[in-house]
């Protein structure tokens, strides 16, 4: 187990945000701690993975990252990356309002610009970028896959169910 203390990156947050803007058009200028804390931590994890690649792992690594919070790690290492989302950031925000997400996903038309209206623009852009630049993009269900395709405009490469169908297994009672 490795614990990552990213507090040393506090003074570098603006530089990291600039890098994200210049390389990926992620607009995080007006974000707060709910974006910046995961940004620092994930960025630090990416630096750690890069160092481990150089010193210990020798090309034997595939990094599996979950949710937008882990996206910045991908900026710092060369190993193949799998990015998984369990639900999109914008989908979660829309689901907590009167927006008919199910219908919009069914018709494949969720306007990404809604992320700004719902206060999740930078998180949405980070998630979309992570899905785009990963070597494999996965979701945890067919429904989440449809949501990701409609919201992020990125079709998942694979569905990796995060559970199993209990009806297919005999009861242990």
Residue ranges and their predicted role:
Residues 1-173:
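Catalytic cores of nucleotide-sugar-dependent glycosyltransferases that transfer UDP/GDP/TDP-activated
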């Amino acid at each position: 187990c490795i614990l990552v203390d990213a507090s040393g990156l506090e003074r570098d947050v603006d530089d990291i945000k600039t890098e994200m803007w210049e390389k990926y058009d992620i607009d995080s200028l007006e974000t707060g701690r709910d974006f910046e804390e995961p940004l620092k931590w994930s960025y630090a994890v990416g630096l750690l993975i890069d160092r481990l690649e150089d010193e210990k792992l020798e090309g034997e690594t595939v990094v599996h990252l979950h949710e937008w919070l882990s996206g910045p790690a991908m900026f710092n290492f060369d190993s193949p990356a799998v990015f998984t989302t369990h639900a999109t950031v914008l989908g979660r925000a829309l689901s907590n309002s009167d927006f008919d997400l199910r219908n919009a996903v069914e018709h494949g038309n969720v306007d990404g610009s809604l992320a700004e209206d719902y206060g999740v623009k930078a998180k949405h852009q980070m998630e979309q970028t992570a899905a785009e630049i990963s070597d494999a993009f996965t979701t945890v269900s067919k429904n989440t896959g449809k949501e990701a395709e409609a919201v992020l405009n990125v079709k998942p490469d694979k569905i990796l169910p995060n559970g199993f169908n209990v009806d297919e297994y005999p009861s242990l009672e």
